[in-house]
């Protein structure tokens, strides 16, 4: 838990992940300005938080290194649903987790979460989020 690695800014692409303000984010857009007379090229990175959905942006030299989260994508079964939490059990380790319904579940699937279904969850930086329902053809 809490795993992250370093990656050079020039290697980042939209759709990948980055840590901004200690929050794992999915990169939405990268704009690179050409090097000027007195400086190196700079990249403006716009990203959306995985857990809070907030848009964040940073400007870094393309030669700089940034933290990238290591995201563990796993399958779990929903054991119980309460008004404010979802209890899930990992299908490999049989570990139990309590996930808050407001911040730990993707908006589109909140109303579809029910006991007994399998879900895909992401674990990164000590936090868990249920991303999608497994086995659902849409």
Swiss-Prot record:
Annotated compartments: Cytoplasm
Molecular-function GO terms, alphabetical: ribosome binding; RNA binding; translation elongation factor activity; translation initiation factor activity
Modified residues (Hypusine): 37
GO biological process entries: positive regulation of translational elongation; positive regulation of translational termination
Keywords: Cytoplasm, Hypusine, Initiation factor, Protein biosynthesis
SMART domains: eIF-5a
Signal peptide: none
One GO CC term on file: cytoplasm
UniProt xrefs under PANTHER family: TRANSLATION INITIATION FACTOR 5A FAMILY MEMBER (PTHR11673)
Entry-linked HAMAP family: eIF_5A
Function, as annotated: Functions by promoting the formation of the first peptide bond.
Family designation: Belongs to the eIF-5A family.
UniProt name for this protein: Translation initiation factor 5A
Organism of this sequence: Pyrococcus furiosus (strain ATCC 43587 / DSM 3638 / JCM 8422 / Vc1)
Lineage: Archaea, Methanobacteriati, Methanobacteriota, Thermococci, Thermococcales
Gene that specifies this protein: eif5a
């Amino acid at each position: 838990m809490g795993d992250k690695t370093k990656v050079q800014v020039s290697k980042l692409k939209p759709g990948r992940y980055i840590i901004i303000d200690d929050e794992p984010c999915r990169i939405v857009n990268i704009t690179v300005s050409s090097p000027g007379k007195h400086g190196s090229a700079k990249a403006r990175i716009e990203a959306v938080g995985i857990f809070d959905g907030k848009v964040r942006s940073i400007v870094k030299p393309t030669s700089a290194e940034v933290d990238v989260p290591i995201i563990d994508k796993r399958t779990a079964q929903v054991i119980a649903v309460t008004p404010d939490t979802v209890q899930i059990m990992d299908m490999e380790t049989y570990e139990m987790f309590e996930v808050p319904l407001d911040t730990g579940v993707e908006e589109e699937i909140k109303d579809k979460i029910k006991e007994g279904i399998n879900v895909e969850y992401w674990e990164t930086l000590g936090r868990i989020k249920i991303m999608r329902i497994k086995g659902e053809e849409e």
